[in-house]
Design a protein with these regions (language model features):
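Short, charge-rich amphipathic alpha-helical segments embedded
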Residues: 75-103
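Post-signal-peptide N-terminal segment of Sec-exported extracytoplasmic proteins
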Residues: 38-79
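Bacterial N-terminal signal peptides that target proteins for export
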Residues: 1-10
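C-terminal motif of bacterial Sec signal peptides marking the signal peptidase cleavage site
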Residues: 17-21
Length: 129
């Protein structure tokens, strides 16, 4: 229980730090999700007008997040991240998704979910690159 609290707190602090360093959108606010599902929506919205490949990968990632297919989501997000055309709002959506995924994976890994443990290891590798 304490580990979950610490993980959630850490994820919140990291997200706040990232967002404070990134600036804000036109209306002065930055969208932050409080769940994996919200992050999936954020990703879809941010890439609605992107190039077809990025939009497709954002859709794949969002759907995979909703279905709990976390490795698939991470691969799609990693593909998007590598594109040089990612704008500010899209970058925020990517970070929002990764932070919410990390929190979800930690919760599931603590409960012994082997797929979550494998996905968390993948997330750590992605974050190193």
């Amino acid at each position: 229980m304490m580990t979950r609290f610490l993980a959630t707190t850490l994820a919140t602090v990291v997200l706040s730090g990232i967002l404070m360093g990134c600036g804000a959108s036109d209306d002065g606010s930055i969208r932050q999700s409080t769940s994996s599902e919200g992050a999936a929506d954020h990703l879809t919205d941010a890439f609605a007008n992107a190039d077809s490949e990025s939009k497709k990968n954002a859709g794949i990632a969002s759907e995979a997040i909703r279905k709990g297919q976390f490795q698939k989501a991470l691969y799609a997000i990693e593909t998007i991240k590598k594109k040089p055309e990612v704008d500010f709002d899209q970058g925020v959506a990517i970070n929002d998704s990764l932070i919410n995924l990390e929190r979800e994976l930690i919760y599931r890994a603590e409960d012994g979910d082997k797929k979550a443990i494998a996905a968390y290891e993948l997330l750590k590798r992605i974050n190193r690159n």
